[in-house]
Amino acid sequence: AAELDESSGSSGTPYTWVRGEEELHEIHLTMAILARHLIDDGSGTSRPVVTLNGFSMGAWATGTNVTAALKRLGVVKSTGPDADKMLSAMALLGTEPVFVIAGYPPFLRRLLDAAREQQFDLSRYTMYGVVGGEGMSEALRNRLERTFASVYSAYGASDLDIGVAAETALSIEVRRLAAAHPELAVALFGTTTRLPMVFQYDPSDYYVETIDHELVVTVTRPALVSPRIRYNVHDAGGTLEYADVITACRALGLDPIAAAFARHPFRPFELPFLYVHGRADSTISFMGANIYPEDVEQALGECADSDVLGAFALALIEIDGRDGTCDAVRPCVHIEVLDPSRVGDGELSARLAGVVRDRLLGNSADFRSAVAEDLAAADIRVALHLEGAGPFVGNATRIKRRYIV
């Protein structure tokens, strides 16, 4: 028996991969064991587990395989990315189960917004988030964890496996320490400009190389119908040995193991780390400085207006000079506004532009240098749009968000 999976097609035409029954069994079992571990709060109590799968369903690998894997935890309902349907399922099933909510990171945010609009009291429920498909800022995680007990991300690709690596309590704390201590970020990732997602992986299943700052993965499990040998999905990142990460932290007086234990009361996995900045080409460049979606997401997620903001996308736009001709380009952040009355709010646009600019000045040496050489580099533009309008047309049917337009 075999299964045909499609990639999302986010970079062009979807590609079809063949997976055999034994291969799928190994993937699903590993995912289920890890998920069970991550939702174990150490209390020793046993409650039924219900997984609500908000990933896109169909021929794509993630949605169908999450359903197949997490059936091993208990009941699964595959709603797809439909917040209303998911809330209806929660109302029907009540507050006794532990809910595992799976989906892309923006969907979990949308679920909270829908609950607020419907006055649906999520505080009565115990929920864990399992996300993947794209990066997640710590600002978004912090926001989600006001409601969720914990939110963990997984790294993978339809072209490889959907569970190549996963966040653990330890990897999350390492990432947070790197965000708070630039010297640690430099020691681990070589830069403070772009905070990567940080995962741990099993080297007995995946041999990961770094070539030209991109991850190259070989799946080493023997039960493969479609071999993946030195496969490059063009994700920028690298790998780190467990001992090297702990040593780098302790050299700065930091103890990620203690912090991880406070988050999840179990001994950390002594597995190597894998860090991912995102797709290698996911950036816009302006006056020699790269502007990354991760920095913009962090800035918008931390700002006071985050409740009314939806998706965003980066672009370079032409601006008119005094004679009506285009005489320059500027970086522009297109932002969805969930409140239609705020779309024309000039004060909101200016405030958001300042938030993004301040984040870049504080986090990007390239951007600071560009501004020091020419103040025009600090001229960040913001364009506000109705939900689903402008560059966000089609977002409702797109599997993954598009961050560069």
Region roles according to the model:
Residues 2, 63-64, 138, 294:
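Residue-level marker for well-ordered alpha-helical positions
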Residues 2-3, 154:
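Short, charged amphipathic recognition helices of the HTH superfamily
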Residues 3-19:
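Conserved adenylation A10 loop of the ANL superfamily
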Residues 8-12, 36-40, 56:
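Generic short alpha-helical segment signal, independent of protein family or function
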Residues 20-37, 50-110:
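AMP-binding/adenylate-forming
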Residues 40, 44-48:
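Short helix-loop-beta connector
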Residues 75, 79-405:
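Active-site glycine/GP-rich loop and adjacent strand/helix microenvironment
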